[in-house]
Amino acid sequence: MVALLTDTVGSPPVVSEETEQGCAGPHTSYQWDGAVVTAWAGTTAFVVGITTSSLGGIRIETTGGFAVGDDIVAFAAAAPAENVGHPSDSDTFVAFDVASRTSSGDYESPVGSVGYATDGVLQSIVTPGEWSSFLC
């Protein structure tokens, strides 16, 4: 993922090693303007965070077609209640590309991506992600 984003953006990332940071634990961050890859120490787990609508001239969007800067008010209003959170009057978390749940209520696979919006405008997307991606 780091090599792909480096090629797309056309420049290397700023790399930082964190031995401990809140609930994130030890990890390495690879940052470009508008994107970050966070990889956890000792695992193959990583997440990609996007805070721009395009990288290297390529539009970055969810499989549903949403990009940073898009209005998601109608989408959030139509989404199932468990896929939308409102931590404040102006802030909204919304899950995109949600996997189906098993009869026990667990997801068959992780949520595809989550977005954070202020006043209905998408500010960032994290994939794979969950609400805590924005709280740590």
Language model region names:
Residues 2-20, 76-89:
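Short secondary-structure junctions
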Residues 63-78:
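Secreted/surface-exposed cysteine- and glycine-rich disulfide frameworks
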Residues 17-64, 86-136:
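Amphipathic N-proximal alpha-helical interface segments
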